[in-house]
Amino acid sequence: MPHPLRFRRIIDQRASSVEKEFPVVYGGTTFYNQMVWIPTFTHPDVAGVTFGGFWAGKYIASQPNAFNGVGGDKPDVADSADPGTCPAISQYGVPSWRYINYWYARKAAANNGVGWHLITAFEWASLAMWSQLNGTQPHGNNKNVNPPADIDFPAETALLDLACNARDASWYANLVGTGPFTWNHNHRADGVSDLNGNMWEWNLGLHMQTADEAGHAGHAVVLGNLNVSLTGSPYGTSTSVAATTLTDTRKAWAVNEFATMWLIDSAGTRFTINSNTATALTLAAGTPASGVYEIVKDTGTDISSGMTSGNKILTLRDGDADLKAFAMAATSDATGAAKYGTDGYWFNTADAGTAPNNIRTAVRGGRWSPGVLAGVFALNLGFAPDVVAFPLGFRLCKSL
């Protein structure tokens, strides 16, 4: 059920924090997305990047009518199914929406309306860097016990997700947001919850090319810019499409800022962008599908080089112009660094399948069982975007 709080503002010496509920109607019922404002800030380790400036889902997304019981994680949309018009909801104390692939997670997030989208890789990095800067990296459900607990802080527990546990008695996911405040990104009541463990979460706009694209295996593909505003961001929902054209009249892009980059449309198809106006992309060839889209670029950097999948993060790519904004591992080993929670980094450069699923797409945070490898910096580039699985979920964000 919706949290009784509709609006709360808390101010301290570090930042202004706002919680707000945004209504959305589905099936004749009004549901409330509980969101947290992430203020803008800079980090001393990352020169030239301003993080924050968006609304983040306080909770991992659920289906609107989710409940804590058998089938309570899929009352509106079946496992693996197209969500249709069903919106994902950020609401307290229910099971996460699981068994949903990346393409459908983008759609379910955007079903809330203008400005709503799947959390981006940059927005996730903002949460990670804020918590690291303020000494509040979140604890979470990563021990796989009942009640759900943190492996380093076993006295910290949450409520068991009975829908997940009914699927397999050895799965101990938690109801979203039911852990202590230390499981929030700021260790306070007004924070973003469950960023450490519980569910791997799809991130918009961070992919890795595979051996399917000769000479490009391991290349990071990232968002076309770091703008988080409704008018400037490199993602959204088209207002019209035609041969070699996608238009989004809500935008005010800089002319040709995306030339030579790629459009990934609602079907996952990738198109080369020849040019753009303030509101339209002109493509080299083809007709894009209408709906959700993202604009990305190939950085040319092999983020698997010199790394071993499953190691722990030692340092981040803070000096890489294309990658420093995404809280990504630069080096790793079997021990890791406490500065980044000894969180893990996984990847797979093997051919993932046929296009558009011949890439790997980022999930972050870890699930209920990786132990110390889970955390807000944990990054897994091992899943193709069409994968559906029990520990894969997602989170909403909203642009202004």
Q: What is the meaning of each model-derived region?
A:
Residues 1-2, 156-162, 170-172, 195, ...:
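C-terminal, surface-exposed recognition/capping segments
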Residues 1-48:
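N-terminal module-boundary/linker segments of secreted carbohydrate-active enzymes
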Residues 187, 268, 391:
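Short coil/loop residues immediately preceding or within conserved phosphate-binding loops
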Residues 230-297:
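Autoprocessing Asn-cyclization modules and mimics
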Residues 66-67, 204-217:
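Cytochrome P450 core scaffold surrounding the K-helix E-X-X-R motif
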